[in-house]
């Protein structure tokens, strides 16, 4: 059998098959244009954007890495508040008596005795020449005439006070000492008619002259010891003998 008579038939079959594929593809595009693509597959596109962060996961277990080196010490912090006082400790034992060089105590005692003897001699000289002693008081005058304020300042300068008799014996001692009228440490400057000593205490002994005190002239706030031993009120601005008393 000859092959040539079959050639037209073969060509016709191929055309028919090609037409069939074309029609089928076109029909498919008309029916599902968005689904079926008859062309060859395209290349991959670019990666899309990252999605949103997911929820935080649970804390994982510590890793197995090596422990790092210890860091340097931090800065010194501020001092804390003082703590409460501790309880007292036990009482210590009595210490041994101290030692002093030999002869010091006996030397001090002898010096003290010599000083006391010398002071006693000086008192006697003063008493004999210028002053009078009664009990534990020593009355002394320098013979100067001055106002009451100056008498107070003079006595304070020598750590004494203006003579203030507390009894008849002291009043007599001052009387025997003076040759002129002398100020006493008594005034009524704060309250008229209420005579007190220079410390503000009321008097427990007085020896007023007859008719005294009379506050003549309304400014007689100081007191004089007269030569007869009695008292008289006078102005403090007048000048009279200064007599001081020293405690002994």
Curated annotation (Swiss-Prot):
Compartmental location: Secreted
Signal peptide annotation: 1-20
This protein's UniProt keywords: Calcium, Coiled coil, Collagen, Complement activation lectin pathway, Complement pathway, Disulfide bond, Hydroxylation, Immunity, Innate immunity, Lectin, Mannose-binding, Repeat, Secreted, Signal
UniProt note: domains: The coiled-coil domain mediates trimerization.
Subunit architecture: Oligomeric complex of 3 or more homotrimers. Interacts with MASP1 and MASP2. Interacts with MEP1A and MEP1B and may inhibit their catalytic activity. Interacts with CR1 (via Sushi 24 and Sushi 25 domains). (Microbial infection) Interacts with SARS coronavirus-2/SARS-CoV-2 Spike glycoprotein homotrimer; the interaction is calcium-dependent and modulated by Spike glycoprotein glycosylation state.
Pfam family, one: Collagen
Entries under SUPFAM superfamilies matching the protein: C-type lectin-like, Triple coiled coil domain of C-type lectins
Domain Collagen-like as annotated: residue spans: 42-99
Cellular component, GO annotation: cell surface; collagen trimer; external side of plasma membrane; extracellular region; extracellular space; multivesicular body; serine-type endopeptidase complex
Any GO molecular function: D-mannose binding
Cysteine disulfide links: 155-244, 222-236
Modified residues (Hydroxyproline): 47, 73, 79, 82, 88
Encoding gene per record: MBL2
Chain positions covered by the region annotation Disordered: 43-113
Gene3D superfamilies: Mannose-Binding Protein A, subunit A
GO BP terms in the entry: acute-phase response; antiviral innate immune response; cell surface pattern recognition receptor signaling pathway; complement activation, classical pathway; complement activation, lectin pathway; defense response to bacterium; defense response to Gram-positive bacterium; innate immune response
C-type lectin domain span: 134-245
Protein name: Mannose-binding protein C
Organism: Homo sapiens (Human)
Basic and acidic residues: bias regions: 49-61, 93-102
Coiled-coil intervals: 112-130
